[in-house]
Amino acid sequence: MLNIFSLICICLNSALYSSSLFFAKLPEAYAFLNPIVDLMPVIPLFFFLLAFVWQAAVSFR
């Protein structure tokens, strides 16, 4: 039971730490990549939605 609690605490701490990294600024040398970097977290959602569209297209044949 203690191990599960420890694992939950570790996961929460890493989630909080990673969310602070999410709002970090790029160095000035890479400032021109800001629009691409802002779009990058959304890209996996496009593949997720594409899977549903593909399944719908296949089932209607």
Curated annotation (Swiss-Prot):
InterPro entries the UniProt entry points to: PSII_PsbK, PSII_PsbK_sf
GO BP term (any one): photosynthesis
Keywords tagged on the record: Chloroplast, Membrane, Photosynthesis, Photosystem II, Plastid, Reaction center, Thylakoid, Transmembrane, Transmembrane helix
Localization in the cell: Plastid, Chloroplast thylakoid membrane
Cellular component per GO, a single term: chloroplast thylakoid membrane
Pro-peptide positions on chain: 1-24
Pfam families the UniProt entry points to: PsbK (PF02533)
Spans through the membrane: 40-60
Subunit-level organization: PSII is composed of 1 copy each of membrane proteins PsbA, PsbB, PsbC, PsbD, PsbE, PsbF, PsbH, PsbI, PsbJ, PsbK, PsbL, PsbM, PsbT, PsbX, PsbY, PsbZ, Psb30/Ycf12, at least 3 peripheral proteins of the oxygen-evolving complex and a large number of cofactors. It forms dimeric complexes.
Role, per record: One of the components of the core complex of photosystem II (PSII). PSII is a light-driven water:plastoquinone oxidoreductase that uses light energy to abstract electrons from H(2)O, generating O(2) and a proton gradient subsequently used for ATP formation. It consists of a core antenna complex that captures photons, and an electron transfer chain that converts photonic excitation into a charge separation.
Record family assignment: Belongs to the PsbK family.
Name of the featured protein: Photosystem II reaction center protein K
Organism: Panax ginseng (Korean ginseng)
